[in-house]
Amino acid sequence: MRIPFVAAVLVGSTLFAAGVFAQDRSHPLPLGTFVDIYTDQSVTSAQKEIGLKEGTWYEGTITVTDVEYYKNTGTGEPFAEIKDMNYRGGCYLLLFRVQDTAKALALKVGDKVVVRGMLSNIGMQTTKYVLVCETRYALFKECEILEIVKPGK
């Protein structure tokens, strides 16, 4: 009985702190904090929706699992989405939308990339990426690729 209570208090405190310190691009929260909460199967979807506020900036290292390119199909500029699907459960997909398509298109699967981005949306859908479960995704926009670390370096 004590362990679930302590876990709930810790998750609640972390969610509250993340909301209080929602900030600007120059003071991002650690992406690892987002990932820990978002992939924690004991945290409800409602708690995630409330605690992981859209508009919050995060920065951290991801592992590239795919990159997709989107052409200018109207008034918008072309962009690329860097995908990271390397989380426990396998049903979590982080999408990082970047305007620097040249850097994004140079990435290879397995590259480690330090990114900074603003949480835009979290949700759930059935996708082609995971057939055994519904994929929970988080979309980050206005992302910057800060550093690329190739495997083995």
Language-model features, listed with the residues they occupy:
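Bacterial N-terminal signal peptides
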Residues: 7-17
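OB-fold and OB-like single-stranded nucleic-acid-recognition modules
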Residues: 22-153
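Positively charged n-region of N-terminal signal peptides that target proteins for export
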Residues: 1-5
